[in-house]
């Protein structure tokens, strides 16, 4: 099975840097590591968000696409999708934290059921301290 996949995310200036950091860390810590993380900057970002993007922990996987002004999630993802180089794309929001085996489980499912076009999963929501589930 081809384990290559891209991750597609969008971020804009009102996002919390600690959430973006946790989201990126959850993807770089996958049991099957992504080939790339395509991150669309939907307009100018804060200094704190820019610092997260420069973190060496993510730098080798991060492919940044920048929009001059905020265009909204749909437009940002439409710009980012053609930049993804893999057949399979895992979608993440900049405040999502993925289980460490999320992508492995999803890719194994796709291997078993190759007729699948779109695949999702369950979520656990959090408020405030993202290390604690609601």
What are these regions (language model features)?
Residues 1-134:
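Nucleotide-sugar donor-binding/catalytic module of glycosyltransferases
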